[in-house]
């Protein structure tokens, strides 16, 4: 049996899970409004990523440019700031 490697060992002391959760909680209102074809796609890709054992930090990282553009266009500077802070710390 091989040992499980923690790929986030360098994030010790950083609540990246909580930060990712907070960002997704804020994104949920945009997802629910579905004013862009991106949101249903993004939701499907998140479910697929989870089924492959990937976490929300990875999902956010994969869609960072698109999320940044959408949040800027919607004027959601709070969520954009949270996403950019997470990017600086963990991505």
From Swiss-Prot:
Gene coding for it: cowN
Keywords: Nitrogen fixation
The keyword Chaperone appears for this protein: no
Protein source organism: Beijerinckia indica subsp. indica (strain ATCC 9039 / DSM 1715 / NCIMB 8712)
Protein's name according to its UniProt entry: N(2)-fixation sustaining protein CowN
Example of a GO biological process term: nitrogen fixation
InterPro entries according to UniProt: CowN (IPR024899)
Keyword match Membrane: no
Top-level taxon in the UniProt lineage: Bacteria
Family statement: Belongs to the CowN family.
Functional note: Is required to sustain N(2)-dependent growth in the presence of low levels of carbon monoxide (CO). Probably acts by protecting the N(2) fixation ability of the nitrogenase complex, which is inactivated in the presence of CO.
